Amino acid sequence: MDRNIENNNGKYFLEVRNITKMFGQFTALSDVSVGIKQGEFVSVLGPSGCGKTTLLRVIAGLEEQNSGSVWIGGRDVSREPVANRQLGIVFQSYALFPNINIIGNVQYGINRRQFSKEQRESRAMEMLELVGIEEQAHKYPAQLSGGQQQRVALARALAPSPSILLLDEPLSALDARVRVYLRAEIRRIQETLGVTTLMVTHDQEEALTMADRVVVIDEGKLMQYATPHELYVSPENTFVADFIGNMNFISDCTGRDPDSIFFGQYILQTLEGRAMNYQGRPVIVAIRPEDIRVIRDESVDYNILKTKVERIEFRGSLYTIRLRVLYEAGGATDQRLNMDLQVEAMESLNIRTQMELPIHLPPERLLLFKRQRGKS
């Protein structure tokens, strides 16, 4: 079994096992395995065209995989139709019926054979109250804002009490302020109901703020599956490091010994043993902009780089300082770094463009990655 679908008792409520999906000669998904616990909120994150929506559609039964299987509640549903999978689905386009009022739209997915009209109306109103738009029950979709329509689509998906909720970029068509509000609302509703949820998004902030764990996909391959914190502080490869947050990469490096790296004329200390596998080999060193420190005194005498300030960008709560690394003996290298400083720190340091600025790269903040042959 793939390491990403193992846990203490070996069971997940939703499991995707070794899924491969082809469209002709194009591989949309390649041997992807993911496990989701009951009640967990998981985001699938990646750039456009990476295969994340294809994964959701395979889980939903809207696309048939070429190989692999989908398990829900310990049952193989790989060949089951959509109707037998007990899913609620919210699409990016909302897919509301324009000629049916809001309460009618929400009722639509509730089984007419199992529930009376009164029961269906009661359940629909309960869901509208949950999403906070019960006062709009008798209006039509065209009379509602985009954010309200998205909440109707969510209420409709939840009305039949699905075992799993699938969200396909549900917030991408909304403006930024509404997106931020609905992020919190969707998570509140999910936690209230305890429904297992999988959300597809290309927005990293959306994924990191909403999900318990995040699946990162690129070119149809699973790049990492971890908590938002783990993705940010311990990315497993350069793709995840670059895609999640902002990252500086120093490519012209070679392993020196188990605890240090050559960067041109500089020696960079790492955590003990971190460089063990890179001795004499090319390596990429990475560090977050907020982890770079300005040298204020002589108390630090290692991992110091000479730099020149090329540009200062104000970004509200912080400044981003664009730096160019200098050789120890003088002259500029081709290496550039971004450093983030809070406004208070920036004001106290009096940093200006074109000034030389010594910086410190803390060993515990340096990440090391294998450099692919032919790549910088």
Q: What function would you assign to each model-found segment?
A:
Residues 45-47:
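The feature captures the beta-strand-to-loop junction immediately N-terminal to the Walker
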Residues 41, 80-88, 92-239:
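ABC ATPase nucleotide-binding domains
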Residues 60:
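Helix-to-loop junction immediately C-terminal to a conserved catalytic motif
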Residues 53-56, 152:
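ABC ATPase nucleotide-binding domain helices that frame the ATP-binding cleft
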Residues 68-76:
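Conserved ABC transporter NBD signature motif
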Residues 247, 256-376:
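Non-catalytic connector elements of ABC transporters
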